[in-house]
Amino acid sequence: MKTLSAKPAEVQHDWYVVDASGKTLGRLATEIARRLRGKHKTSYTPHVDTGDYIVVINAEQVQVTGKKSLDKKYYRHTGFPGGIRETNFEKLIAHKPEAVLEKAVKGMLPKGPLGYAMIKKMKVYAGTEHPHAAQQPQVLDI
């Protein structure tokens, strides 16, 4: 039996909606990264984007365990010499709740053109409303 190799034109991408309220950040991010990559499908091919679209709602209600809300650091650089900036989980979730989940999932995906295409298929929203009702996303319980 020959090995199946998916072709980009033949891949079917489904839409799923995930409710992040009360979920642990890391456990949620690993499952989302797995689905974006397409590893849950039998037609998974490493060099082809076989993953699904994921819509995450209630990103502001994602949780971390222990003292990570104060200890977990996020870094960014302004582009100027000495321009490294640091913030913790608590401040970032208050200011930009979508960025926490996006950074967690992005770090779990491959780096390069294929990984960039995968991260674009994840849509994160702080509240319960999202503009993707036309795609009829299925509820995914994680």
UniProtKB/Swiss-Prot annotation:
Coiled coil: none
This protein's record includes keyword Ribosomal protein: yes
Gene3D superfamilies: Ribosomal protein L13
Domain of life: Bacteria
InterPro entries with a match to the protein in the record: Ribosomal_uL13, Ribosomal_uL13_bac-type, Ribosomal_uL13_sf
A cellular component annotation (GO) from this entry: cytosolic large ribosomal subunit
Alphabetized UniProt keyword annotations: Ribonucleoprotein, Ribosomal protein
GO BP terms in the entry: negative regulation of translation; translation
SUPFAM superfamilies: Ribosomal protein L13
MF-aspect GO terms: mRNA binding; structural constituent of ribosome
Signal peptide as annotated in the record: none
Annotated family: Belongs to the universal ribosomal protein uL13 family.
Assembly and binders: Part of the 50S ribosomal subunit.
Task of the protein: This protein is one of the early assembly proteins of the 50S ribosomal subunit, although it is not seen to bind rRNA by itself. It is important during the early stages of 50S assembly.
Name of the protein this chain belongs to: Large ribosomal subunit protein uL13
Organism (species): Acinetobacter baylyi (strain ATCC 33305 / BD413 / ADP1)
